[in-house]
Structure formats: C-alpha cells, structure tokens
Amino acid sequence: MTPKRPAVAWVPGRGDVIWIDHNPQAGREMKDHHPFVVLSTAGFNRSVGLVVGCAMTSAAYNRGSSLAIDLGPIPGRPDAHSFVLCHQLKSFDWKARGARPHPLARLDGDKLEQVLEIVGQILGFLP
C-alpha cells in the first residue's frame, strides 16, 4: 500500500488573482474584499507570509487611466471591465486576511508584464 502524500497547502504566487480583505483602510485606499493580483513569488509568500501586489476593481472611471490595466469584460457582466490598479501597490499578511483563489485564477503573461512595467516605473526601477 502506497502511503498518502500530505496535502500541499495553497500558496499564492506571481500572477495569481486572489480575494483579500483590504480593511482597515484610510483615505483613497481600496477597502473591503476585492480581487488582488499577486506580484511576489510563491517562495517569498510562503517564507515571509506576505503577498505584494496590486488591488483590482471594476470601477468604470479607471477606463483609460495610464495607471490601470484593463483586463476586459467580466464574465456575465459584459458592460463591466476588470482593472488592475498599478498605483495601489500593497503588501498583506495573506493568511491573516483570509486570502483565497479568485475565479480569474491568473493574469496572462502579457497583462502581467504590463502591470510589472508600470509598477517598475512608479518605483523607479524602470525608465
């Protein structure tokens, strides 16, 4: 009889879209449960217990913003789009905030690269 392997605990990784609680918040920061795209690696997230990434929203006023990546229509809501807010870069204790996978699952390579490029420009890593 083959021994059962222990279940591998879920750890979010770069490009994953997760649900996370943004509260508490202040000022113009995102609040409540929202999707969040993870930019940090699974190894970092596992060892440090934090995720670094960007908030996501469906607020239409983000359309056309140079700081928001339009991911396209939301399934079942053709008039609403999902946006990654590259200027809402945050780190969260993903376990304490009850992070869980989002139905979008992952950003495709091109969209993730766009997010990383804008974040790099904001932080001065890229020209």
Residue ranges of predicted features:
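Conserved functional hotspots at enzyme active or ligand-binding sites that engage polyanionic ligands
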Residues: 1-127
